């Protein structure tokens, strides 16, 4: 990457994961925390497809490299955070990209998170065994 090349930034969040995504003109390689993307995501096709989805929606799969710093959570949350961060970076690239990305749902934050444990219960909703006597 040359020092004068254009870089587009986007931040994504999912569950407890936070991803800072940079889009750089290139050939479509994905680098996550300094490792190749498919290696970092354990070669799981669902995670890899989720990361590439925003670029594929716009047909830019081989035009930009994705460089990511991500922390927190597991691979599901991290891949979702990277997807949202890449979509936000593509919106920064051009305002025309926003509508198709929004239609496909790449820009919306998934609000689902782990439910808190309540006192008197073993887990969030699991109650101790009921005894009549």
UniProtKB/Swiss-Prot annotation:
<dbReference type="InterPro" id="IPR023035">
    <property type="entry name" value="Ribosomal_uS9_bac/plastid"/>
</dbReference>
<feature type="region of interest" description="Disordered">
    <location>
        <begin position="98"/>
        <end position="133"/>
    </location>
</feature>
<feature type="compositionally biased region" description="Basic and acidic residues">
    <location>
        <begin position="98"/>
        <end position="113"/>
    </location>
</feature>
<dbReference type="InterPro" id="IPR000754">
    <property type="entry name" value="Ribosomal_uS9"/>
</dbReference>
<dbReference type="GO" id="GO:0006412">
    <property type="term" value="P:translation"/>
</dbReference>
<dbReference type="InterPro" id="IPR020574">
    <property type="entry name" value="Ribosomal_uS9_CS"/>
</dbReference>
<keyword id="KW-0687">Ribonucleoprotein</keyword>
<keyword id="KW-0689">Ribosomal protein</keyword>
<feature type="compositionally biased region" description="Basic residues">
    <location>
        <begin position="114"/>
        <end position="133"/>
    </location>
</feature>
<dbReference type="GO" id="GO:0022627">
    <property type="term" value="C:cytosolic small ribosomal subunit"/>
</dbReference>
<dbReference type="Pfam" id="PF00380">
    <property type="entry name" value="Ribosomal_S9"/>
</dbReference>
<dbReference type="InterPro" id="IPR020568">
    <property type="entry name" value="Ribosomal_Su5_D2-typ_SF"/>
</dbReference>
<dbReference type="GO" id="GO:0003735">
    <property type="term" value="F:structural constituent of ribosome"/>
</dbReference>
<dbReference type="InterPro" id="IPR014721">
    <property type="entry name" value="Ribsml_uS5_D2-typ_fold_subgr"/>
</dbReference>
<dbReference type="GO" id="GO:0003723">
    <property type="term" value="F:RNA binding"/>
</dbReference>
<protein>
    <recommendedName>
        <fullName>Small ribosomal subunit protein uS9</fullName>
    </recommendedName>
</protein>
<comment type="similarity">
    <text>Belongs to the universal ribosomal protein uS9 family.</text>
</comment>
């Amino acid at each position: 990457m040359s020092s004068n090349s254009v870089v587009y930034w986007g931040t994504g969040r999912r569950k407890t994961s936070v991803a800072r995504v940079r889009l750089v003109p290139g050939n479509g390689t994905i680098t996550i925390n300094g490792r190749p993307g498919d290696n970092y995501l354990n070669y799981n096709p669902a995670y890899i497809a989720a990361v590439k989805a925003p670029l594929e929606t716009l047909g830019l799969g081989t035009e930009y490299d994705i460089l990511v710093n991500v922390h927190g959570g597991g691979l599901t949350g991290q891949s979702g955070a990277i997807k949202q961060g890449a979509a936000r970076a593509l919106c920064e690239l051009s305002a025309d990209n926003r509508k198709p990305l929004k239609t496909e749902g790449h820009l919306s934050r998934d609000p689902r998170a782990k439910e808190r444990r309540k006192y008197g219960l073993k887990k969030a909703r699991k109650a101790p065994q009921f005894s009549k006597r």
